[in-house]
Design a protein with these regions (language model features):
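Serine-hydrolase catalytic machinery in alpha/beta-hydrolase-like enzymes
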Residues: 33-129
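Short beta-strand/loop motif that positions the catalytic acidic residue
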Residues: 183-185
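Short alpha-helix in the alpha/beta-hydrolase fold that links the catalytic acid
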Residues: 179, 190-202
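Primarily recognizes the serine-hydrolase "nucleophile elbow" in alpha/beta-hydrolase
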Residues: 121-177
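Sec-dependent N-terminal signal peptides
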Residues: 4-13
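Short, proline-enriched alpha-helix->beta-strand connector loops that line the catalytic pocket
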Residues: 176-181, 205-207
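Boundary at the C-terminal end of the N-terminal hydrophobic targeting segment
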Residues: 17-19
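C-terminal catalytic histidine-bearing segment of alpha/beta-hydrolase fold enzymes
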Residues: 207-244
Length: 244
């Protein structure tokens, strides 16, 4: 009987580690006649101190209608750390494909602007749905093309967010501003376009952080990474989120 009680207690302890709630839902932006699918990772305890993270996935060729769920290693980890995570599905099957040539600051801008509109609408609606959350310290995170969207949002709506993190974005120039605090994790296999990343002097001036991860490629930051690589990414991102 004593052994059964111990096993039961251990099971409860294990379950408590995964006690956050995950669900999918959709918003509808009538002004753009657009559905915005979401994956939500809600921590066990939610109150006025609970910070919100808006996550934006990398480009997937409009082929995967669950791209926003392929970064669960990160979104679940952050939820377990007490953050309320909303992961946006930016690509719909009938969307125009992402430009693969030309000046990307011009040819990809319509895609990024659509992403910025998705993020802004999601923030506006969830402020109504979840007013009990901490919206004063809003955080954006994005990988690759989602990181480009994140940096464009930080450029256009800096007053709405506290921190923004890109995971190996390569095209959108990071704004040289002190608020929000900006952070980027760099893979080891691709360079960025000219001027995207701040110089060392600019990093110091604007309190921006650029961190290169040796042995972690661009695709490793998505679902193709190993558990060890994902754990490393998680720790770097969590470290920045708790940095003041």
């Amino acid at each position: 009987m004593k052994k059964l009680i111990i096993v039961f207690v251990l099971l409860l302890s294990a379950l408590s580690c995964f006690s956050q709630t995950e669900f999918t839902t959709c918003l509808f932006d009538t002004s753009r006649n657009r559905v915005i699918p979401l994956a939500v990772y809600q921590p066990h305890k939610v109150n006025l101190k609970t910070k919100v993270i808006i996550f934006s996935h990398g480009y997937d060729g409009n082929k995967n209608n669950k791209s926003n769920q392929t970064y669960a290693y990160l979104t679940r980890f952050l939820s377990q750390k007490g953050f309320y995570v909303i992961s946006i599905q930016h690509e719909l099957v009938d969307d125009p494909l992402l430009a693969m040539e030309g000046n990307f600051m011009e040819t990809r801008m319509p895609n990024w602007e659509r992403g910025v509109a998705n993020i802004l609408f999601t923030i506006q609606e969830f402020k109504k749905l979840k007013p009990q959350l901490n919206w004063n310290d809003l955080i954006l995170i994005g990988h690759s093309n989602g990181g480009d969207m994140t940096m464009l949002f930080a450029t256009r709506y800096p007053e709405l967010i506290n921190k923004a993190i890109s995971m190996d974005h390569r095209r959108m120039i990071m704004p040289r501003i002190q608020k929000p605090l900006l952070y980027t994790l760099r893979g080891c296999d691709y360079d960025t376009d000219y001027g995207v990343l701040p110089t060392e002097k600019e990093q110091e001036q604007f309190r921006m952080k650029v961190v290169k991860l040796d042995g972690v490629t661009h695709s490793n930051m998505g679902e193709n990474g190993t558990e060890e690589q994902h754990n490393l990414i998680n720790q770097y991102i969590y470290g920045f989120l708790t940095w003041r």
